[in-house]
């Protein structure tokens, strides 16, 4: 199963395609491609371009991607996303999934900088949002 995450920021837009084997659900999603492009004047256009380029790079058709999650400054401008989630929620979920020993996350974006220390403090928020 392929999924895509798209982060639309004020400066750059990133897309990543992940593959997860449904036959082996204990294996974490594997990155099969990613792209980073300038956002430019249209976050919607940048999101679509990054998605198409990531699919091309992974040799995956857009139809093979079962879910698209958008985050970042321009996340609400991505009509083809199945879900949009705030950056802090994405950071927390990603860190807890892939890097359980990490205690600090720093996000340096084009408009703002965010830091979150001690990821255990994120558990109540994740519980409330239904992520755990």
Where are these regions (language model features)?
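Structured core elements
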Residues: 5-7, 14-17, 69, 77, ...
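Conserved phosphate-binding catalytic cores of ATP/NTP-utilizing and phosphoryl-transfer enzymes
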Residues: 73-119
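Conserved glycine-centered beta->alpha loop in an early N-terminal alpha/beta scaffold
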Residues: 48
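Short glycine-rich, Thr/Ser-proximal phosphate-binding strand/loop in the N-terminal lobe
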Residues: 5-45, 53, 121-129
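Short beta-strand-loop/turn "lid" adjacent to the catalytic site in phosphate-handling enzymes
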Residues: 33-40, 57-89, 123
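Generic secondary-structure signature for well-ordered alpha-helical cores
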Residues: 18, 23, 52-60, 70, ...
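Short glycine-aspartate micro-motif
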Residues: 3-7, 65-69, 103-106, 126
């Amino acid at each position: 199963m392929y999924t895509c995450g798209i982060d639309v920021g004020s400066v750059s837009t990133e897309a990543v395609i992940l593959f997860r084997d449904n036959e082996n659900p204990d294996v974490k999603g594997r990155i099969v491609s990613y792209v980073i492009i300038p956002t430019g004047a249209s976050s919607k256009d940048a999101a679509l371009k990054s998605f198409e380029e990531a699919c091309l790079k992974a040799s995956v058709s857009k139809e093979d991607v079962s879910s698209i999650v958008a985050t970042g400054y321009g996340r609400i401008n991505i009509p083809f996303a199945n879900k949009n989630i705030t950056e802090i929620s994405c950071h927390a979920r990603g860190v807890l999934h892939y890097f359980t020993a990490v205690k600090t996350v720093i996000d340096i974006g084009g408009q703002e900088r965010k830091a979150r220390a001690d990821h255990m403090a994120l558990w109540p928020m994740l519980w409330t949002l239904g992520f755990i």
